[in-house]
Amino acid sequence: MSVEWKFVDTNVLVYLFDADAPEKRTRAQELLRKERDCIVLSIQVLGEFYVTVTRKFAESMSLETAARAVDAFSRFRVQPVHPETVNAAIHRSRSMRLSYWDSLIVEAALSAGAGVLFTEDLQHGQRIDDLQIVNPFRDGD
């Protein structure tokens, strides 16, 4: 049986710890529980998570707690980012007018063979090559 990989963007992981967004926190928890066997992340996602929760929260997470969270997330499949991925992201950012960082997420998801990208940073329902963009926080879905 093959796995349909689903790529999870940084914002989904951040909401797991965001006390100021309880509804999104619950949705993120439900998503990770439901999809736990087919989740793929990237090195970029792990790094962005660490920086966001330790520097950008109203009440920053301790460095130790953030490091433990990154360690826990590392148990999911983690897609490496290779020079080819970076070059593809540069090209995509120019051709689709996406930010480089969003393009790198897209390219990592495609490289991982993911069919779905869970994010709130791109347009819900959009298809990018073989990748379906899904905003898990969108109302009515």
Predicted regions and their residues:
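Acidic, PIN/NYN-like endoribonuclease modules and their adjacent C-terminal/linker elements
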Residues: 1-5, 106-141
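Short, well-structured N-terminal submotif of metal-dependent ribonuclease cores
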Residues: 1-41, 56-64, 140
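Short acidic, glycine/proline-enriched helix-loop-strand junctions
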Residues: 66-70, 76-87, 95, 122-141
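Active-site neighborhoods of divalent-metal-dependent phosphate/nucleic-acid chemistry enzymes
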Residues: 75-120
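Substrate-recognition element of Asp-dependent hydrolases with the DxDx(T/V) motif
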Residues: 40-44, 119
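Active-site-proximal, substrate-binding regions of enzyme catalytic domains
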Residues: 50-76
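Acidic active-site catalytic centers that drive phospho-/nucleotidyl reactions
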Residues: 9-11, 48, 102, 121
